[in-house]
């Protein structure tokens, strides 16, 4: 099976402490905790087993999403534009060796800790990625070369045991609420809300730094 992948915005990233402007709360503002990798030049047709060598840096991403806008765009059969504004990135990109034993199988085997308005929202583990980064790179490079600096995101960090680990995005929690109660209970974000994300080594040190951001209304 081919992995789900879309081509996102490449010319703009928010910093880890930036306020994030949006036009309307009605658009369904959602955070989305992810990992990512930055590659060197990847030749067209690179196979998954050869893609590991092209991974040069690991990063932590908040892939902002506008969930109310997404369904209409998905129905077109083309990629997202309005539903996927600029992402945020943590302060530090690290080489794979800096992650030590946590970097294996093309995955980051650490918890992504997420809080929303100072309340724990989830700590899913990156080791449960259904497809490793090396496989994602091979998929993206199947019919094109990837230039040095290309960023490949993991998608939402999510675990099967979500009841214990929580979530890294609101949409997943709302989906589970629909499954188990028949309707979503958790609202999307409001202006003034804050989201924090970080990844800790087992000894407690931060791997990428902290994403600490507030949602604000765009000034007209």
Q: In which residue ranges do the predicted regions lie?
A:
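Glycine-enriched loop-and-adjacent helix/strand subsegments that border the catalytic/binding cleft
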Residues: 1-139, 184-187, 212-220
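Conserved metal-binding segment of the jelly-roll/cupin
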Residues: 9, 15-16, 89, 146-158
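Residue-level marker for beta-strand->alpha-helix junctions and adjacent short loops that shape enzyme
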Residues: 96-99, 159, 202
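A structural signal for short secondary-structure junctions
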Residues: 106-108, 144-146, 187-192, 205-207
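Generic detector of contiguous secondary-structure segments
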Residues: 137-149
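Active-site pocket scaffolds in enzymes
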Residues: 150-192, 198, 211
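Structural signal for terminal/edge beta-strands and the immediately following C-terminal loop/tail
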Residues: 196-220
